[in-house]
Amino acid sequence: MQIMEPFESGFTIYSKSGCSNCTKVKKLLIEKQFFFVDISCDEFLIEDKEQFLLFIKEKTKKDYKTFPMVFKDGKFIGGFDDVQKYFDKLLCFDENEIF
């Protein structure tokens, strides 16, 4: 079983069927006009769930088992709530503001 690595550019979403937060995070990224790659994990979960979770643990550096699993530029962000927080932090900074 070959699992795609998180992309080094843009957002990578590991999702599964029937996951409402997976749908929400994709909708949010579309609304914000961000490029993302969606990797459906249904097959991985059926074929070898243990191997998939070990792969995710290696990438996230934690025991993360909930969907979606979202990465930005190859770095783990978290799930839907974490992506919302990520965008909230971006909005806190005005790009024209000088520090």
Predicted regions: what is each one?
Residues K72-F99:
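Non-catalytic, surface beta->alpha helical segment in thiol-disulfide oxidoreductase systems
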